[in-house]
């Protein structure tokens, strides 16, 4: 069986995501679509609006055959590391192709770009370190670098999906047998579009409408199972965790904060200075952000603090990856069975005594996530892969 991989977050799953899954199958000719999906904490450092089990269910009912969780150590990361984790798991699963969305309005040869980076990494690094403007954010620096070393590309690092597409291409090119890339142009709504019109809207616009209690506006833009979840489940945001985050920052010593992953350049002092005056998560971010430290960078740091993540813990997961199965259709289950002998990573279907140490960071992340609201179900123990048959 041929498999096409997609790397996703589904925050929440909407009609554009269903189109992506359909296009992945159609353009690649694959029998199976495999989604590597972030768990309860996401790439930009946000808690998911709906828990990972609800989002996996939405995916399985709308064109995805197998949902694998992207471990927290990979999911709450900059684009390059997020891509590194996703590609690693898809390669382990023997996927022949990768389909991803792009915000780019012009045709871009992502595979050629990935090959260029693979062959010119030292030049790229040298150009990056030669930049003199220390106030530029990482995306701004990378845009400047590629305008110098690869001018014909006209890359724009301001678009999140475009950045991810380039990161996928770079990482994919490092493997002996790269996957075939299928970029899909976004249908109607862009990543940052905050308005809803028609049946396709961005996840940003959907979340904004949900938090503004404008659920009727959202319903035409999502499949029925997502609509059901949005109407019956508690919606989660950073404000659910603000008391825990504030307590953690206040009670931690500077030395303890310094031990947190990505706590660099004295950010622990700035956090200590600003935390008492901040009355909400949003206010803390506004007080902390600068041209150099973007909202997203600081939001990821807040997640690392909340989860008490350390560099050693993150690197342990990077070196000891695994495939945690969240759900499958009969096709997805058959594919796992067919490829099991070739898969070099542990395949995990439930949290147990045998794998608790390996999954320790994910378990802790899930426990913290569950603390965000009393209505949230158990996320770790007693949970087995969801099964969905499209014919039922």
UniProtKB/Swiss-Prot annotation:
SUPFAM superfamilies: Nucleotidylyl transferase. This is tRNA(Met) cytidine acetate ligase. The keyword ATP-binding applies. ATP binds at residues 7-20, 101, 161, 186. Coiled coil: none annotated. Catalyzes the formation of N(4)-acetylcytidine (ac(4)C) at the wobble position of elongator tRNA(Met), using acetate and ATP as substrates. First activates an acetate ion to form acetyladenylate (Ac-AMP) and then transfers the acetyl group to tRNA to form ac(4)C34. Belongs to the TmcAL family. The gene is tmcAL. One of its GO terms (biological process) is tRNA modification. The keyword tRNA processing applies. Keywords: ATP-binding, Cytoplasm, Ligase, Nucleotide-binding, RNA-binding, tRNA processing, tRNA-binding. HAMAP family: TmcAL. One of its GO terms (molecular function) is ATP binding. It catalyses: cytidine(34) in elongator tRNA(Met) + acetate + ATP = N(4)-acetylcytidine(34) in elongator tRNA(Met) + AMP + diphosphate. Its EC number is 6.3.4.-.
């Amino acid at each position: 069986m041929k498999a096409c991989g997609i790397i996703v977050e589904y925050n929440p799953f909407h009609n554009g995501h269903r189109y992506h899954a359909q296009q992945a199958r159609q353009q690649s000719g694959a029998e199976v679509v495999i989604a590597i999906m972030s768990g309860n904490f996401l790439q930009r450092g946000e808690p998911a609006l709906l828990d990972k089990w609800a989002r996996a269910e939405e995916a399985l009912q709308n064109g995805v055959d197998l949902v694998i969780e992207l471990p927290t150590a990979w999911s709450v990361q900059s684009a390059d590391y997020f891509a590194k984790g996703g590609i690693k798991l898809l390669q382990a699963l023997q996927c022949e192709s990768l389909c991803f969305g792009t915000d780019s309005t012009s045709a871009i040869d992502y595979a050629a770009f990935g090959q260029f980076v693979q062959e010119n990494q030292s030049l790229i690094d040298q150009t990056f370190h030669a930049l003199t403007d220390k106030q530029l954010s990482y995306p701004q620096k990378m845009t400047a670098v590629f305008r110098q070393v690869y001018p014909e590309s006209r890359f724009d690092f301001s678009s999140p999906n475009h950045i991810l597409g380039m990161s996928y291409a770079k990482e994919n090119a490092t493997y002996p047998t790269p996957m075939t890339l299928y970029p899909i142009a976004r249908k109607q709504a862009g990543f940052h579009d905050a308005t809803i019109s028609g049946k396709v809207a961005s996840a940003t616009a959907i979340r904004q409408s949900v938090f503004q209690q404008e659920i009727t506006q959202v319903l035409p833009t999502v499949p029925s199972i997502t609509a059901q979840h949005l109407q019956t489940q508690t919606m989660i945001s950073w404000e659910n965790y603000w008391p825990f985050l504030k307590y953690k920052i206040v009670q931690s010593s500077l030395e303890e904060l310094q031990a947190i992953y990505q706590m660099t350049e004295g950010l622990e002092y700035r956090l200590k200075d600003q935390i008492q005056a901040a009355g909400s998560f949003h206010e803390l971010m506004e007080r902390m952000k600068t041209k150099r430290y973007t909202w997203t960078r600081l939001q990821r740091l807040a997640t690392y603090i909340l989860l008490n993540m350390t560099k050693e813990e993150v690197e342990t997961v990077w070196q000891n990856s695994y495939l945690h199965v969240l759900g499958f259709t009969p096709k997805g289950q058959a594919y796992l069975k067919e490829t099991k002998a070739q898969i070099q990573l542990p395949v995990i279907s439930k949290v147990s005594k045998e794998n608790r140490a390996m999954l320790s960071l994910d378990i802790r992340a899930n426990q913290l996530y569950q603390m965000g609201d009393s209505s949230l179900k158990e996320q770790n123990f007693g949970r087995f892969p969801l099964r969905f048959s499209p014919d039922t």
